[in-house]
A protein has these predicted regions:
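Short loop/turn segments at beta->alpha junctions
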Residues: 104, 224, 289-292
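C-terminal coupling/interaction segments
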Residues: 2-7, 266-304
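Conserved NTP-handling cores and scaffolds of large molecular machines
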Residues: 116, 232, 301-304
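ABC transporter nucleotide-binding domains
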Residues: 11-16, 21-196, 201-215, 221
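Alpha-helix N-cap/helix-start and coil->helix boundary motif
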Residues: 20, 106, 201, 242, ...
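Residues that line or immediately flank small-molecule/substrate-binding pockets and catalytic motifs
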Residues: 167, 239, 290
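ABC transporter nucleotide-binding domain
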Residues: 179-269
């Protein structure tokens, strides 16, 4: 697995061991070992259908694992009593954003507030300032984006220690997405642990400190964002004549692009050795460039 974190690095809010979920013959999640650090923002990246939602639902007690184990704040996710305690300390905003359609926005805010003694009225007010939801409108008449905003308001305001968000920006316009991401950053700065799933790499790169990538039910990347990006480089070499791609295939080279006499390599670690190889092939110039999280995602997931 790429960039796996040492268990001695930090404390963890979430830990899983071989966590798996099978639906008939389909393995939705397979042998997941995932350690989510306590405190910062963690992004959970994967394509649609990769297993993100199933994983989060298992963590929050909405789906029972087929095998393996998991803990949140040291509490067993498969134990009914401990799962109740988990839901007191961690809030789950699911992808389907289920709400009571017959209520108005104001009614469901008031209704939800009554169940949570640690309700953050300051966050409620802050959220409504950024997203002036129509308080007298019934939920069934809200747009998809407004339903997402309302679900986030109800989750964020509960005063929990941790937010578990499944596709929290789904249905939002670019301005609203930016506002939500900035709000999540401010909550993390207060010490709240945030784990959110997304298939939008740019959102994860913008705010996440740690990233987990899942591909067809398997965890393929687990790392801090900075460490992961520092482990990759893009090398752009210009030759006097075209180069044979076979001469560029070597350990550490993850992707090769050739356009005439210009070669672009995506490399993982040990870039100096590969640079020396390019020089031995008589490269006229070699530029070393950073790699985006999107490129790393495509290398580990999308390119398969």
């Amino acid at each position: 697995m790429r960039g796996e974190m040492s268990t001695s690095e930090c404390r963890f809010a979430v830990r899983t061991h071989q966590l798996s979920k099978r639906y008939g013959e389909i393995e939705a999640v397979r042998h997941l070992d995932m350690n989510v650090p306590l405190g910062p923002i963690s992004g959970f990246l994967g394509q649609n259908g990769a297993g993100k939602s199933t994983t989060l639902k298992m963590l929050m007690g909405a789906v029972r694992p087929s095998s393996g184990s998991g803990q949140i704040f040291g509490l067993n996710i498969a134990d009914a009593t401990q799962s109740v305690e988990i839901r007191k300390r961690a809030v789950f905003v699911s992808e389907d954003k289920r709400l009571y359609d017959y209520m108005t926005v104001e009614q469901i805010i008031r209704f939800t507030r009554s169940f949570f003694p640690k309700w953050r009225s300051d966050l409620e007010a802050k959220f409504l300032k950024h997203f002036p939801l129509p308080l007298d409108r019934r939920i069934k008449k809200l747009s998809k984006g407004m339903r997402t905003q309302l679900a986030l308001l109800l989750g964020i305001s509960r005063g929990a220690e941790m937010l578990v968000l499944d596709e929290p920006t789904e249905g939002l316009d670019p301005v609203a997405i930016e506002t939500v991401l900035e709000l999540l950053k401010s909550l993390a700065a207060e010490g709240m642990t945030i784990l959110f799933s997304s298939h939008q790499v740019a959102e994860v790169e913008q705010i996440a400190n740690y990233v987990f990538m899942i591909d067809r039910g398997e965890l393929v990347v687990s790392s801090s964002v900075d460490r992961l990006k520092n482990g990759y480089r893009r090398l752009v070499a210009v030759f006097d004549t075209p180069v044979n791609g076979k001469d560029l295939a070597m350990g550490g080279v993850k992707r090769i692009g050739i356009a005439g006499a210009m070669v672009t390599l995506t490399v993982e670690r040990d870039s100096e050795r590969i640079i020396e190889h390019l020089r031995s092939l008589r490269a006229r110039t070699i530029d070393v460039l950073p790699v985006t999280l999107k490129e790393i995602f495509l290398q580990n997931v999308g390119a398969k």
